[in-house]
UniProtKB/Swiss-Prot annotation:
Belongs to the DnaJ family. Its cofactor is Zn(2+). SMART domains: DnaJ (SM00271). It comes from Acinetobacter baylyi (strain ATCC 33305 / BD413 / ADP1). Homodimer. This is Chaperone protein DnaJ. One of its GO terms (biological process) is chaperone cofactor-dependent protein refolding.
Length: 368
């Protein structure tokens, strides 16, 4: 089943402010929270859907990516979607706004740690960017330690639950009328104490490792577009790995220049073909096509080939190819060619106004 538009899920416009997005999510979260709707699968699905939408639209970078690429921005790693995010973590951002409103408001939970997001720059040809491509990338990033299986200790018995916070990673301090939750200083928020750390990772549970992934780049991407690979960023012990963002850089093309959905190119035309007119062949991204050059074509004349441009991500419209004529003046003339040009020059000197319309308008303006 196709995912709904995130703005539609929250019931806000695409120009909604951060505050409007937060209020919309809070309203839906209050309505569909599982504690208010026990054994209601439909309410649980709506709560998760709203939380997923809020996770993206409340983050300026993710929102910008979504506005440009839609759900494609987060489905490049094969796994798709938002496999690792926690709706409860998002929900907890509202703190005491919800505290005590639901059955679980008073219980203490360990906030799951999350690794840092990583960035990988992928260089593409224009053809790859326009058509989409699958590429294999290799990079080095912190991954679960293979010696201790990411536990921080080879022997599970050497890992104890922190006695200060009882494994939650946080402690509650009473300050007057208010109860404040803080990171446990004994275990530093880990919830566990390692008595005998792994010698390979020194108890961190992670180690740098070379990784290889296949990335699917959707058709129509442009410079600066990013694809998110959920959970492929920095790994952390007893926590959620960050994401890997693959940023697209499109190499300069020898023929075409891209501007949004449109492509531009210069078409060299001989002075004879420009004067007399001719049907020529030009390249496009889909193969060669014919272009009719009318008699008397001047440098700078633009011809538009509709539908020969690019279909951007999240668009059903295909741009155009705009061909700019560049009339070439011949060089290294033979003696015969020089004679012919002199003859032509002699015939044009007395009739330059009719044969050179731009020259005529130039001198008319000059002497007005």
């Amino acid at each position: 089943m196709a995912k709904r538009d995130y703005y539609e899920v929250l019931g806000v416009s695409k120009t909604a402010s951060d505050d409007e997005i937060k209020k919309a999510y809070r309203k839906l979260a209050m309505k569909y929270h599982p504690d208010r709707n026990p054994d209601n699968a439909e309410a649980e699905d709506k709560f998760k859907e709203a939380s997923e939408a809020y996770e993206v639209l409340s983050d300026s970078e993710k929102r910008s990516m979504y506005d440009r690429m839609g759900h494609n921005a987060f489905e490049g790693g094969g796994g798709g979607g938002f496999g690792g995010f926690s709706a409860e973590d998002i929900f907890s951002q509202f703190g005491d706004i919800f505290g005590g409103a639901f059955g679980g408001g008073g219980r203490q939970q360990q906030r799951q740690r999350r690794g840092s997001d990583l960035r990988y720059v992928m260089e593409l040809s224009l053809e790859e960017a326009v058509r989409g491509v699958k590429k294999t990338i290799t990079f080095t990033a912190p991954a679960p330690c293979e010696v201790c299986d990411g536990k921080g200790s080879k022997n599970p018995n050497d890992v104890e639950t922190c006695r200060t916070c009882h494994g939650t990673g946080q402690v509650r301090m009473q300050q007057g009328f208010f109860s404040v939750q803080q990171t446990c200083g004994t275990c530093r928020g880990q919830g566990k104490i390692i008595k005998n750390p792994c010698q390979s990772c020194h108890g961190s549970g992670v180690a740098d490792r070379q990784q290889t992934l296949e990335v699917t780049i959707p058709a129509g991407v442009d410079n600066g577009d990013r694809v998110r690979l959920s959970g492929k960023g920095e790994a952390v012990r007893d926590g959620q790995a960050g994401d890997l963002y693959v940023e697209v850089v499109v190499r300069e093309h020898e023929i075409f220049q891209r501007d949004g959905a449109d492509l531009y190119m210069d078409v060299p035309v001989s002075i004879a073909d420009a004067a007399l007119g001719k049907e020529i062949e030009i390249p496009t991204l889909e193969g060669r096509v014919s272009l009719k050059i009318p008699e008397g074509t001047q440098t700078g004349k633009l011809f538009r080939l509709r539908g020969k441009g690019v279909r951007p991500v999240r668009s059903s419209m295909v741009g155009d190819l705009l061909c700019r004529v560049v009339v070439e003046t011949p060089v290294n003339l033979t003696s015969r060619q020089r004679e012919l040009f002199k003859e032509l020059q002699a015939t044009l000197d007395g009739d330059e106004h009719s044969s050179s319309p731009k020259k005529k308008s130039f001198f008319d303006r000059l002497f007005d």
